[in-house]
């Protein structure tokens, strides 16, 4: 997720598991980039031009869904890193992708976050009715189902699964659309008026409110209900989606959810 302390980072050396990079002639790996808790992300260059190389753990169908989505969004004005195809025109090779390096800084205050909210609204409007990502499930489906995407409610203690589902219930109203799924400072770059959303690995179809759940409290969002309930839903989602993949982070988020509910009554 977006917490720099969470998750398991693959510290593979640049020479290990990168043979597929030969499909992009002249691309040289430089160093790991921050984040990459579930996927390895490297800074690279070709002929002096900076690039980003990522290895995705998603299935081919789930990765193709992500890349189709990003093409659709760029056509509608949502800034996202531009994919660099292989020399023979493929979008990825066994989960390895190359994209342009996006300049910018992370959001620094309410004005930046308001621009992020505006960009998210464009994303949600542009994807109403979009098909669900293969293998994933929306929070509404997971009120009954045990798993979907990275969520493994069936692997949690029953009391934790009940807590998570109860936190999701108040946010189920509204349209279904694509949500980025991991909106936080490290996944947003601001460059003047341009706001770029990075790392769409956790994108899915759900109610739009999850993308606003963990934004700073002082930032106004389109969510029409109680802000404490929205934050509880976001903390519950992070607990559920990280339970298996990032267990230390998930349990930290669970503790935060308990504290939040005690203090707010949400």
Segments the model singles out, each with a brief description of its role:
Residues 1-29:
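Juxta-kinase regulatory segment immediately upstream of eukaryotic protein kinase catalytic domains
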Residues 24-45:
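ATP-binding glycine-rich phosphate-binding loop
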Residues 54-94, 107-123:
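A conserved alpha-helical element in kinase catalytic cores
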Residues 95-109, 147-150, 236-251:
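A glycine-centered beta->alpha junction motif in the catalytic cores
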Residues 106-158, 176:
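A cross-family kinase active-site recognition segment
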Residues 178, 190-231:
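Active-site Asp-x-Gly
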Residues 178-180, 185:
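Catalytic-loop of the protein kinase fold
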Residues 213, 217, 221-266:
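Helix-rich C-terminal or lid/interface subdomains of diverse kinases
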């Amino acid at each position: 997720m977006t917490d720099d302390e969470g998750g398991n980072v693959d510290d593979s050396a640049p020479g290990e598991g990168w043979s597929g990079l030969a499909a992009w002639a002249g691309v040289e790996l430089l160093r790991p980039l921050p984040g990459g808790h579930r996927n390895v992300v490297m800074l690279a260059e070709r002929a002096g031009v900076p690039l980003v190389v990522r290895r995705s753990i998603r299935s081919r169908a789930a990765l193709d869904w992500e890349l189709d989505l990003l093409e659709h969004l760029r056509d509608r004005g949502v800034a996202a890193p531009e994919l660099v195809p292989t020399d023979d025109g493929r979008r990825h090779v066994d989960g390895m992708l190359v994209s342009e390096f996006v300049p910018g800084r992370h959001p620094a205050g309410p004005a930046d976050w308001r621009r992020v909210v505006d960009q998210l609204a464009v994303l949600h409007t542009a994807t109403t009715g979009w098909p669900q990502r293969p293998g994933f499930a929306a929070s509404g489906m997971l009120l009954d189902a045990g798993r979907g995407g990275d969520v493994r409610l069936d692997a949690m203690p029953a009391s934790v699964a009940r807590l998570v589902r109860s936190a999701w219930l108040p946010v189920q109203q509204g349209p279904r659309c694509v949500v980025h799924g991991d909106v936080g400072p490290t996944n947003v770059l601001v460059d003047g008026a341009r706001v770029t959303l990075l790392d769409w690995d956790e994108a899915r179809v759900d109610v739009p409110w999850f993308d606003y759940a963990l934004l700073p409290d002082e930032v106004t969002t389109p969510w029409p209900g109680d802000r404490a309930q929205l934050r509880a839903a976001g903390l519950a989602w992070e607990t559920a989606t990280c339970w298996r993949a990032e267990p230390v982070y998930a349990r930290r988020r669970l503790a935060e959810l308990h504290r939040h509910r005690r203090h707010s009554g949400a």
